[in-house]
Amino acid sequence: MSAPFVLAVPSKGRLQENAEAFFARAGLTLSKPGGARDYRGTIAGLDNVEVAYLSASEIAANLARGSVHFGVTGEDLVRESITDADKRVLLIDGLGFGYANVVVAVPQAWIDVRTMADLDDVTTGFRAQHNRRMRVATKYINLTRGFFAQHNVVDYRIVESAGATEGAPAVGTAEMIVDITTTGATLAANGLKVLDDGVMLRSQANLVASREADWSDTARETARVILDHIASRARAGKYKEVRTRFKGCNDALLAEAHSRFGVVSPFGGPTSSGMLTLHCPPAQIYALGSFLRQHGADTVSVAALDYVFDKENPLFSKLAAFLPQ
């Protein structure tokens, strides 16, 4: 029996809820046969898949080791904890939740410090005056070093933070911070501001693949099935299905609809009886319906699409190109 395909998802909180909802929308229902406290799960219909419930940081570490095939975790953790991340893991797709920015934040009282260039001047002057480097509180050590090096900021030292990083300047353990934020409200409440060019990374939850995992033929086929579900759901979300029938429809009219409303005709032009099926961006539905009625359609129906399966699967093609041949 072949080894299981391991999908790692967050083990608690909103990230777990959002991850499970994302897969459910794609027709992949995650469940825990052992109960809510079980840290192993399954996907209905995919018997060889084992779902591992881990913390977001553990997921990144397991992706680096190759002990999981797919994992759901933030890009910030991937970039911070995996050396040469682009060679070892693949960010297959952003999942549309878990948004947050990794930022450089300084005290609001530093009214003349707005950019990284300003920060360079201040850190240099601080060292000359106090004979020590400015302290940066953060848990993003590698991201901070890389970003500061890009901006030629060298007169600083990192103070590793295990939590409540935004409070470090107020209690005197650091002069500034690098931290993750969604709205900036917590930073502002602690008297901090984000530098104008201080957004280091715009992160969100991603579906990530490990190059180091055991990519047997069975594992690749399982990945193809999972990504086919996800791609079909994503494709369906871009369109509504529009159906009508009228004798006045011809190639010229269809070409005009394509160019004006961004529609696609997945099954070709109208049938001999004039039946036409189009996929239309939601924002163009009313305009398309008016256009079709102006040209002879009596009735135009609109329906939501659950899935649109296509011969090509761009997500799996992306994965296949990344994995060892």
Swiss-Prot record:
GO molecular function, one term: magnesium ion binding
Pathway note: Amino-acid biosynthesis; L-histidine biosynthesis; L-histidine from 5-phospho-alpha-D-ribose 1-diphosphate: step 1/9
EC number per UniProt: 2.4.2.17
Disulfide bonding pattern of the chain: none
InterPro entries per record: ATP-PRT_HisG_long, ATP_PRibTrfase_cat, ATP_PRibTrfase_CS, ATP_PRibTrfase_HisG
Domain of life: Bacteria
Presence of keyword Transferase: yes
Cofactor: Mg(2+)
Subcellular location: Cytoplasm
Catalytic activity, reaction form: 1-(5-phospho-beta-D-ribosyl)-ATP + diphosphate = 5-phospho-alpha-D-ribose 1-diphosphate + ATP
BP GO annotations: L-histidine biosynthetic process
Enzyme class: transferase
Modulation of this protein's activity: Feedback inhibited by histidine.
GO cellular component, one term: cytoplasm
UniProt keyword list: Amino-acid biosynthesis, ATP-binding, Cytoplasm, Glycosyltransferase, Histidine biosynthesis, Magnesium, Metal-binding, Nucleotide-binding, Transferase
Its job: Catalyzes the condensation of ATP and 5-phosphoribose 1-diphosphate to form N'-(5'-phosphoribosyl)-ATP (PR-ATP). Has a crucial role in the pathway because the rate of histidine biosynthesis seems to be controlled primarily by regulation of HisG enzymatic activity.
Family recorded in the similarity comment: Belongs to the ATP phosphoribosyltransferase family. Long subfamily.
Cross-referenced HAMAP family: HisG_Long
NCBIfam families the UniProt entry points to: hisG
PANTHER family reported for this sequence: ATP PHOSPHORIBOSYLTRANSFERASE, ATP PHOSPHORIBOSYLTRANSFERASE ATP-PRTASE
Name of the featured protein: ATP phosphoribosyltransferase
Native species: Rhodopseudomonas palustris (strain TIE-1)
Gene: hisG
